[in-house]
Amino acid sequence: MFSELDLLDFATFDGGATTEAAFASPANQTYDLSSSVPSSVSNMGTVSPQELLLHEPYLSAPSSTALTALTSPSLFDGSPDFDTFDISPNFGHSDLENPDTWFSLFPDATPLPQAQAQVQTQPQTQTQTEQQTQPLPELVQSVQPTVQPTVEQTVHSVEASPATPSEDLEVLSPGSGHQRRKSSVSPPSGRHSSVAGVGSRRRDKPLPPIIVEDPSDVVAMKRARNTLAARKSRERKAQRLEELEAKIEELIAERDRWKNLALAHGASTE
């Protein structure tokens, strides 16, 4: 009874124009934007955003390459020609090009005020100036109490050192003139090297004693202590060498004894 009607067959309120003419694309009809699309898929009743945003400069290219998804510029803040259109989200040029409007990812460090920096640096500068302008006698008095205990402590440590009594160290006492206090050192009566037949490598004459005329002289006392330590080290090395030489002689004698015993029982020398 009723025939099937299409939406495009209805007339609009613009004076009898068809729906297809009313909803046609506002783009220039000279170029067919759907030429690259099959006719079965193309529908002139729909309007795409790209067709609405086409301007005259872009109509010089074919419809298939006018606006593509890969090569065309971005429609959002992509060209000054699009500034007249209200395109969502409508990012302006100033919003993207000015880095001052960007929010900081990390909290900004508060700079130190210049006045506070001057207040903090002023006492240090004043203290340095006072130290530089301090008279020389006051500096000597401020340094002397710290040096004097060091001298006394050094002399006491050298005199109380356990290595001092066993070495030839002579210290001239201040009130005894040229009298010398010499440590009692008794050299060993016999040497192990002479018994083992090893030649002695020590000095024929004893080393001269170490004399310190001024016990308050820190440099002289330190030099004497270093000399004593060096003599003790050389003495220990010499004794160790003599012990090793004696051990070698003992092993050689034992080897010769076992060798002669083996030869007496008919062992071959090869």
UniProtKB/Swiss-Prot annotation:
Role, per record: In N.crassa grown under amino acid starvation conditions, this protein is required for increasing the transcription of the genes coding for many amino acid biosynthetic pathways enzymes. This transcription factor binds and recognize the DNA sequence: 5'-TGACTC-3'.
Self-association state and partner proteins as the record states: Binds DNA as a dimer.
Keyword match Nucleus: yes
All residue ranges annotated as the bZIP domain in the record: 216-270
Family: Belongs to the bZIP family. GCN4 subfamily.
Start-end of Low complexity biased regions: 184-195
Chain spans, region Basic motif: 222-240
Stretch list, region Disordered: 114-135, 153-213
Localization per Swiss-Prot or TrEMBL: Nucleus
Gene Ontology molecular-function annotations: DNA-binding transcription factor activity, RNA polymerase II-specific; RNA polymerase II cis-regulatory region sequence-specific DNA binding
CC terms in the record's Gene Ontology section: nucleus; transcription regulator complex
Keywords, ordered alphabetically: Activator, Amino-acid biosynthesis, DNA-binding, Nucleus, Transcription, Transcription regulation
GO biological process, one term: amino acid biosynthetic process
Species this chain originates from: Neurospora crassa (strain ATCC 24698 / 74-OR23-1A / CBS 708.71 / DSM 1257 / FGSC 987)
Family annotation (Gene3D superfamilies): Classic Zinc Finger
Region (Leucine-zipper): 241-248
Gene name of this polypeptide: cpc-1
Name by which UniProt lists this protein: Cross-pathway control protein 1
